[in-house]
Amino acid sequence: MRAGEYGNAELHRELESRAAFPQDAGTDDATSEAGAVEIIETHLSRLYFVGARVFKVKKAVDLGFVDFSTLEQRKFACDEEVRLNRRLAANTYLGVRPIVRGPGGAVRVGGAGAPVEYAVEMVRLPAAQMLDAKLARGEIDRACVDRIVARLAGFHEHAERGPEIDRFAAPEAVARNVLENLSGSRAAAQRFDEACGATAPSLSPLLARFLEGAFARFTADERPRFERRITEKRICEGHGDLHTGNLCILPDEVVAFDCIEFSRALRCLDVAADLAFLLMDLDRLGFRAFGRDLALRYSQRTHDPTLLALVPFYKAHLACVRGKVAALRGAGSAEAPVRAHSRSEAIGFFAQSASYALPPLLLATSGLPGSKKSFVARALAPRLDAVHLQSDFERKRLAGVAPTEPTAPEARAQVYFRTKRDRCKILF
């Protein structure tokens, strides 16, 4: 099998039958049709939703950064997936089931016989309680933010640490990781564009060069900061794939599932990087203010103020990772709707990555009195993740006058004179 080529397709077709799965999988109100098997496909796995259970089968693929090309490798990855995910989803991951062929040649999950494949068995979580679904319905409040922060902070506090883990977050390792991922993103995007006959690139050479320069400069300039993070014990064996679709907000528990099982290098990381994945996804969905609040609360709870300075860098890197994954998913599908959606996602993620690497922007509004300058600026600020400064208040601040205190006519000239004299200090 060529590297990157999808295998075990015949087996996957046989698993589309309900008869292949255990009868004790139970029932679930979310199942749209009695006895139906619902299937979700990713670039690495196929998930079979059967009643109250989910069975996840890894594809026989070798994509370079992950190799599932042999049965032994897939079995090991299944075992690791259960072990690692039980840290944050102990009641969800039930174990690894062998997939065997019966005497008549029919495939079934579980039972006696020589395994032809393996599946991770999970409890089916309610789709309506996933974080992305709750956000879409406007059901997230301050208490929910606190629950998420407490769950992630507690997980990171007790996660495995040590020199073998720290090495994955050393400055040279971080630089190598982000630049290798960018190179892989270029290759994946190019293959995807060629496969679907795109006339414009998903990741343009100009944008790729911009990201390469930004990543190289940041990792070089911030080397002392990366080293301090190791000294401060901010590196751990984390989750590695914390996005809104992998968090389920249950009444009595926050469940984080589907962590990175296939690469220790990708899940051994700075806690800032683990959190940044979730923050980047919140930005993508239009909940930037929610993410900012979550990051601040996490920083305060963990007494980690320097975390916030690294978040934009990790957001940029992880958005690029998501862009590469979208390109790989699109290239691996022959279905036009999947390719179109994947291409849109890839372009969006690569653009989002670049947005975090852009230099600071100063945007000033001007106009006649009463022309809604402050109204427009106030509305734009949260959308641009910007600080809203009002000239009236800034002038008074420089003159030592309270924002709500009226300026006497005789003092007004002095306020404006001082503002004019110090305007460069205000802006720069």
Give each language-model segment a name:
Residues 363-365, 391:
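Hydrophobic anchor at the beta1->P-loop junction of P-loop NTPases
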Residues 401-428:
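Conserved nucleotide-sensing/catalytic segment adjacent to the nucleotide-binding pocket
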Residues 368-369:
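The conserved Walker
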Residues 292-357:
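Helix-rich C-terminal or lid/interface subdomains of diverse kinases
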Residues 376, 380:
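Hydrophobic positions on the alpha1 helix immediately C-terminal to the Walker A/P-loop
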Residues 257-258, 386-401:
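Short beta-strand-centered segment that lines the nucleotide-binding/catalytic pocket of NTP-utilizing
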Residues 8-239, 244-321:
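Conserved ATP-binding subdomain of kinase catalytic cores across diverse folds
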Residues 373:
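Conserved lysine of the Walker
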